Amino acid sequence: MKFQQILSQKTMHVQKISRFFMFSMYEKYKKFIPKTKNIQIIGTNGKGSTGRFLALLLLEQGCKVGHYTSPHIFEFNERFWLNGKIASNELLEKAHEELESVFLDDVKKLSYFEYATFLAFFVFKDCDYVILEAGVGGEYDATSVFEIDFSVFTKIGFDHQDLLGKNLEEIARTKLKAMSAKALINHKQEVKVLNLAQKIANLKQASLNISSLD
Protein backbone atom coordinates (compact mmCIF):
# COMPACT_ATOMS: atom_id res chain seq x y z
CA MET A 1 0.00 0.00 0.00
CA LYS A 2 1.40 3.41 -0.99
CA PHE A 3 2.09 6.04 1.63
CA GLN A 4 -0.63 8.35 0.22
CA GLN A 5 -3.19 5.60 0.73
CA ILE A 6 -2.07 5.07 4.30
CA LEU A 7 -2.36 8.80 5.03
CA SER A 8 -5.84 8.97 3.53
CA GLN A 9 -6.99 6.47 6.17
CA LYS A 10 -5.72 8.57 9.08
CA THR A 11 -6.75 11.91 10.58
CA MET A 12 -4.27 14.67 11.42
CA HIS A 13 -6.39 15.86 14.35
CA VAL A 14 -5.02 14.77 17.72
CA GLN A 15 -7.95 13.64 19.86
CA LYS A 16 -5.93 12.18 22.71
CA ILE A 17 -2.36 11.27 23.57
CA SER A 18 -1.69 7.57 23.97
CA ARG A 19 0.82 7.20 26.76
CA PHE A 20 1.90 3.69 25.96
CA PHE A 21 1.00 2.66 22.40
CA MET A 22 3.86 4.47 20.65
CA PHE A 23 6.30 3.16 23.23
CA SER A 24 5.05 -0.41 22.77
CA MET A 25 5.46 -0.13 19.00
CA TYR A 26 8.98 1.24 19.43
CA GLU A 27 9.95 -1.54 21.83
CA LYS A 28 8.57 -4.13 19.44
CA TYR A 29 10.47 -2.88 16.39
CA LYS A 30 13.39 -0.79 17.67
CA LYS A 31 16.07 -3.22 16.49
CA PHE A 32 14.87 -2.63 12.92
CA ILE A 33 14.71 1.17 13.15
CA PRO A 34 17.76 3.02 11.78
CA LYS A 35 20.01 4.47 14.50
CA THR A 36 20.95 8.14 14.37
CA LYS A 37 22.00 10.92 16.75
CA ASN A 38 18.79 12.68 17.70
CA ILE A 39 18.10 16.25 18.79
CA GLN A 40 14.58 16.91 20.06
CA ILE A 41 12.98 20.36 19.92
CA ILE A 42 10.21 20.93 22.48
CA GLY A 43 8.21 24.03 23.33
CA THR A 44 5.22 26.15 22.40
CA ASN A 45 6.73 28.73 20.06
CA GLY A 46 9.74 28.70 17.76
CA LYS A 47 10.25 24.96 17.36
CA GLY A 48 10.28 24.99 13.57
CA SER A 49 12.67 27.92 13.14
CA THR A 50 14.98 26.64 15.89
CA GLY A 51 15.11 23.18 14.35
CA ARG A 52 15.81 24.53 10.88
CA PHE A 53 18.56 26.80 12.21
CA LEU A 54 20.26 23.82 13.86
CA ALA A 55 19.80 21.72 10.73
CA LEU A 56 21.43 24.36 8.53
CA LEU A 57 24.25 24.82 11.04
CA LEU A 58 25.01 21.09 11.06
CA LEU A 59 24.73 20.92 7.28
CA GLU A 60 27.32 23.71 6.96
CA GLN A 61 29.63 21.62 9.15
CA GLY A 62 29.47 18.81 6.60
CA CYS A 63 26.98 16.61 8.47
CA LYS A 64 24.13 14.71 6.87
CA VAL A 65 21.00 16.11 8.51
CA GLY A 66 17.31 15.32 8.60
CA HIS A 67 14.76 17.72 10.07
CA TYR A 68 11.34 16.33 10.97
CA THR A 69 8.71 18.98 11.59
CA SER A 70 4.95 19.42 11.74
CA PRO A 71 2.38 20.31 10.70
CA HIS A 72 2.81 20.78 6.97
CA ILE A 73 1.25 23.68 5.08
CA PHE A 74 0.71 22.32 1.60
CA GLU A 75 2.12 18.82 1.27
CA PHE A 76 3.01 15.96 3.62
CA ASN A 77 6.54 15.97 2.15
CA GLU A 78 7.26 19.28 3.91
CA ARG A 79 7.62 17.41 7.19
CA PHE A 80 10.83 15.76 5.96
CA TRP A 81 13.79 18.04 5.19
CA LEU A 82 16.88 16.12 4.15
CA ASN A 83 20.23 17.82 3.54
CA GLY A 84 18.64 21.06 2.41
CA LYS A 85 15.76 19.66 0.37
CA ILE A 86 12.19 18.56 0.96
CA ALA A 87 11.84 14.79 0.55
CA SER A 88 10.45 13.65 -2.80
CA ASN A 89 7.47 11.34 -3.26
CA GLU A 90 9.89 8.69 -4.49
CA LEU A 91 11.98 8.88 -1.33
CA LEU A 92 8.90 8.79 0.89
CA GLU A 93 7.52 5.80 -1.00
CA LYS A 94 10.78 3.92 -0.61
CA ALA A 95 10.87 4.75 3.11
CA HIS A 96 7.24 3.63 3.43
CA GLU A 97 8.02 0.30 1.81
CA GLU A 98 10.86 -0.25 4.29
CA LEU A 99 8.66 0.75 7.22
CA GLU A 100 5.82 -1.48 6.06
CA SER A 101 8.16 -4.44 5.60
CA VAL A 102 9.02 -4.15 9.30
CA PHE A 103 5.68 -3.16 10.84
CA LEU A 104 3.44 -5.16 8.49
CA ASP A 105 -0.22 -4.67 9.54
CA ASP A 106 0.81 -2.60 12.56
CA VAL A 107 1.33 0.31 10.15
CA LYS A 108 -2.44 0.63 9.97
CA LYS A 109 -2.70 0.94 13.76
CA LEU A 110 -0.46 4.01 13.94
CA SER A 111 -1.98 7.49 14.12
CA TYR A 112 -1.10 10.05 11.45
CA PHE A 113 1.67 11.58 13.55
CA GLU A 114 2.95 8.24 14.84
CA TYR A 115 3.20 6.94 11.29
CA ALA A 116 5.00 10.08 10.10
CA THR A 117 7.42 9.90 13.03
CA PHE A 118 8.44 6.30 12.38
CA LEU A 119 8.63 7.05 8.66
CA ALA A 120 11.10 9.86 9.37
CA PHE A 121 13.73 7.42 10.61
CA PHE A 122 13.61 5.49 7.35
CA VAL A 123 13.72 8.71 5.33
CA PHE A 124 16.71 9.88 7.39
CA LYS A 125 18.42 6.50 7.82
CA ASP A 126 21.76 7.69 6.39
CA CYS A 127 21.90 10.90 8.44
CA ASP A 128 24.45 11.79 11.08
CA TYR A 129 21.85 13.85 12.95
CA VAL A 130 18.06 13.86 13.03
CA ILE A 131 16.26 16.87 14.47
CA LEU A 132 12.84 15.92 15.82
CA GLU A 133 10.18 18.53 16.47
CA ALA A 134 7.76 17.37 19.15
CA GLY A 135 4.16 17.40 18.02
CA VAL A 136 2.09 17.81 21.19
CA GLY A 137 3.65 18.07 24.63
CA GLY A 138 6.88 16.26 25.35
CA GLU A 139 6.85 13.44 27.86
CA TYR A 140 4.32 11.36 25.94
CA ASP A 141 4.92 12.78 22.47
CA ALA A 142 5.61 10.27 19.70
CA THR A 143 9.10 11.71 19.18
CA SER A 144 10.05 11.04 22.81
CA VAL A 145 10.16 7.25 22.57
CA PHE A 146 13.42 7.39 20.62
CA GLU A 147 16.87 7.76 22.15
CA ILE A 148 17.45 11.50 22.41
CA ASP A 149 21.01 12.80 22.60
CA PHE A 150 20.16 16.46 23.17
CA SER A 151 16.98 18.33 24.13
CA VAL A 152 16.27 21.93 23.15
CA PHE A 153 13.40 23.76 24.86
CA THR A 154 12.01 26.85 23.16
CA LYS A 155 9.55 29.25 24.80
CA ILE A 156 6.93 27.31 26.78
CA GLY A 157 3.45 28.81 27.04
CA PHE A 158 -0.20 27.85 26.88
CA ASP A 159 -1.06 25.33 24.17
CA HIS A 160 -3.19 22.19 23.81
CA GLN A 161 -4.67 22.77 27.26
CA ASP A 162 -7.26 20.06 26.62
CA LEU A 163 -4.42 17.55 26.32
CA LEU A 164 -1.51 18.91 28.35
CA GLY A 165 -2.97 20.69 31.36
CA LYS A 166 -5.01 23.65 32.48
CA ASN A 167 -2.19 25.84 33.78
CA LEU A 168 1.35 26.74 32.76
CA GLU A 169 2.98 24.51 35.38
CA GLU A 170 1.15 21.42 34.15
CA ILE A 171 1.95 22.19 30.51
CA ALA A 172 5.60 22.94 31.28
CA ARG A 173 5.97 19.80 33.38
CA THR A 174 4.84 17.41 30.64
CA LYS A 175 7.17 19.13 28.17
CA LEU A 176 10.18 19.34 30.48
CA LYS A 177 9.90 15.73 31.65
CA ALA A 178 11.07 14.73 28.16
CA MET A 179 14.47 16.22 29.03
CA SER A 180 17.45 14.12 27.94
CA ALA A 181 20.82 13.86 29.70
CA LYS A 182 22.00 17.01 27.91
CA ALA A 183 19.63 19.92 27.39
CA LEU A 184 19.35 23.60 26.53
CA ILE A 185 16.45 25.90 27.42
CA ASN A 186 15.62 29.36 26.09
CA HIS A 187 16.05 31.96 28.82
CA LYS A 188 12.87 33.82 27.90
CA GLN A 189 10.61 31.77 30.17
CA GLU A 190 8.43 32.47 33.16
CA VAL A 191 10.52 32.15 36.32
CA LYS A 192 8.40 29.21 37.47
CA VAL A 193 9.16 27.40 34.20
CA LEU A 194 12.92 27.88 34.62
CA ASN A 195 12.71 26.75 38.24
CA LEU A 196 10.77 23.65 37.22
CA ALA A 197 13.29 22.94 34.47
CA GLN A 198 16.16 23.03 36.95
CA LYS A 199 14.25 20.82 39.39
CA ILE A 200 13.60 18.20 36.71
CA ALA A 201 17.22 18.41 35.55
CA ASN A 202 18.37 17.75 39.12
CA LEU A 203 16.04 14.77 39.46
CA LYS A 204 17.25 13.33 36.17
CA GLN A 205 20.87 14.31 36.87
CA ALA A 206 20.81 16.04 33.50
CA SER A 207 23.16 18.76 32.30
CA LEU A 208 20.88 21.75 31.65
CA ASN A 209 22.16 24.99 30.16
CA ILE A 210 20.15 28.20 29.85
CA SER A 211 20.59 30.02 26.55
CA SER A 212 21.17 33.77 26.70
CA LEU A 213 20.58 34.16 22.96
CA ASP A 214 17.38 35.76 21.65
Listing of model-derived features with the role each one plays in the protein:
Residues 57, 123, 144, 177, ...:
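Hydrophobic/aromatic ligand-binding patch that stacks against planar heteroaromatic rings
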Residues 43, 113, 185-188:
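Glycine- and other small-residue-rich loops at beta-strand/loop junctions that grip anionic moieties
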Residues 1-43, 50-52, 56-63, 68, ...:
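Short functional linear segments
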Residues 23-27, 32-35, 60-146, 162-164, ...:
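ATP-dependent carboxylate-amine ligase catalytic core
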Residues 54, 120, 197:
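Aromatic/hydrophobic pocket-lining residues that form π-stacking "cages" and hydrophobic walls in ligand
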Residues 129, 133, 148-214:
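Acidic, Mg2+-coordinating active-site environments of NTP-dependent enzymes
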Residues 45-47, 72-73:
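Short active-site-proximal "capping" loops at secondary-structure junctions
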Residues 8, 59, 100, 198, ...:
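Class I S-adenosyl-L-methionine
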